Amino acid sequence: MTLKYTEDHEWLKIDGDTATTEGVVVTVGITHHAQDALGDVVFVDLPEVGALFAQKEVAGVVESVKAAADVYMPVGGEITEVNEALRADPALANSDPLGAGWFFKVKLSDASQLAALMDEIGYTKFSA
């Protein structure tokens, strides 16, 4: 498992081989930093399964007691699954942002887009 991060405070979990885009699916959520800045999450708007998005396109919204924020696609691709548990209990984004609080899964359209994302060390420096 490999984690990558965006400047918009989303994370991607990469399972498997990214040498080919065929069948590569990544899980996407918001970072601990993002959920901490938002405060208590009260609503999430998730994309539809089967929807196609370009990299950096808005794919969802997360609302908290403090603010609303867009969730951007860290990579282009097709939504293969959304986290229905998160829709039912948005607080999972706060209590377990890197685990049970994931937002959606995406089948990559271009694995080369992963190269522009930050690793954990880079993201830690960026968000400090």
Where are the language model's segments positioned?
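Short, charge-rich, low-complexity interaction segments located
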Residues: 79-95
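Histidine- and aromatic-rich ligand-binding microenvironments
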Residues: 70-74, 107
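Acidic, low-complexity mobile loops and tails
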Residues: 1-58, 91, 95-128
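A short beta-strand motif that forms part of the nucleic acid-binding face
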Residues: 32, 66, 75
